[in-house]
């Protein structure tokens, strides 16, 4: 069993990201308790790709009350679970339904009584206890620190433009496509989506109608160590012209919204033509963002897409958007 602690930002989208990655390893989500998602998966290392998560780990068990969780702790052979020193960390979620004061100390004492050493400052193993509707306990494998994503924000790139998706969201969009080999971004801009996909080991393809953006994206990809890429000047409404005879396993993209750029045609017409172009080269899934005042559902389904997910985000007072997950039928 695994657990993932997702971000409070876009929680439904974060849960869908976990589900998409779990499915790549024949896994399923069993339950979500506020910001804790638990389930089964053949190999938890797939979660190294996560974007909208605080951490993930191995789930040891759960309890309906404190007595249950303490009985579970007493029944485990901790010398077979813990490597080196340990510390217990407690996470009290908004929906915590239990009295958990000092619970981490009590659990730590039980484990220590089995002959294991505590190190609160630099433990080799971190045991996580979560309080929600139920109580959960697991072993942390990886914590995703904000700093590593901040280093890839638009203003930290050598070639920068102010309007770009946050790296965590871009990464989640790539994951929602369930890509395993390659991905295309037909509105690549400065390459943020391609950077995240490339760092996951995917081959990345991108086009942009502006030559300066293409050259800038190359600079950014090289800066972050992404080597397996093909980027060129191209029109998102004419992808086949940019890549003759090529189809793509997955597409993830964030088209211009029309507020920060001069569009080459009417905004809604651009979106429609771009969706038609993407449909013509797509083998699997598309993850795409649109402003909330664009009727993407109707347009996409008319083209032939099956919309399998939609997630709302209010960015600021003058912009709200939906992230869509679509499949080519």
Swiss-Prot record:
Its EC number is 2.1.1.213. Coiled coil: none annotated. Keywords: Cytoplasm, Methyltransferase, RNA-binding, S-adenosyl-L-methionine, Transferase, tRNA processing, tRNA-binding. It comes from Pyrococcus abyssi (strain GE5 / Orsay). It catalyses: guanosine(10) in tRNA + 2 S-adenosyl-L-methionine = N(2)-dimethylguanosine(10) in tRNA + 2 S-adenosyl-L-homocysteine + 2 H(+). This is tRNA (guanine(10)-N2)-dimethyltransferase. Catalyzes the adenosylmethionine-dependent methylation of the exocyclic amino group (N(2)) of guanosine at position 10 of various tRNAs. Acts via a two-step process that leads to the formation of either N(2)-monomethyl (m(2)G) or N(2)-dimethylguanosine (m(2)(2)G). Pfam families: THUMP, UPF0020. Gene3D superfamilies: Vaccinia Virus protein VP39. SUPFAM superfamilies: S-adenosyl-L-methionine-dependent methyltransferases (SSF53335), THUMP domain-like (SSF143437). Belongs to the methyltransferase superfamily. Trm-G10 family. GO terms for cellular component: cytoplasm. It comes from the Archaea.
